[in-house]
């Protein structure tokens, strides 16, 4: 990943170590294993993808994680991003709306020894309130607006990274940071993610 990640500006050594350690080929199908370490997304079935390594690194770095952090992930997919997080933090909670993907990711993560990841099937728009508040929230699929339930579940000083924009349209990666009662919002870069699915995904956000 040297050219893909380090030479493109990723500096967080915890993220870099995790990216080197996690076997990305274990998170893709047999037919895509030769491309597992290429810097582009790959299909994982059910209309979903595993994100390109550089974007995984960018999003992980922006969260400013430490080993005591508790993280909520929306969009488990293959489980790759959760594994990266699990190498860095104490506990990861991950929500996946596609039951087959959730089950496969849970089995895969357990097999690889990531016992600090909990996976559940559910509507990611609603988050996982039972374990809130979170130090960090990462969303790996794009809602059109910031989901208010996720903002509510972000702890004091917490950071959220998520793509925003319409399916098939112009999207951007955003960083949200809770500062007291305010949410500071910063645009990071243009991106292209699969759309957040779920019955409440189109609900307007008060932060847009």
Locate the predicted segments by residue.
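Class I SAM-dependent transferase core
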Residues: 1-72, 80-84, 88, 101-118, ...
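Conserved nucleotide-cofactor-binding alpha/beta core module
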Residues: 64-184
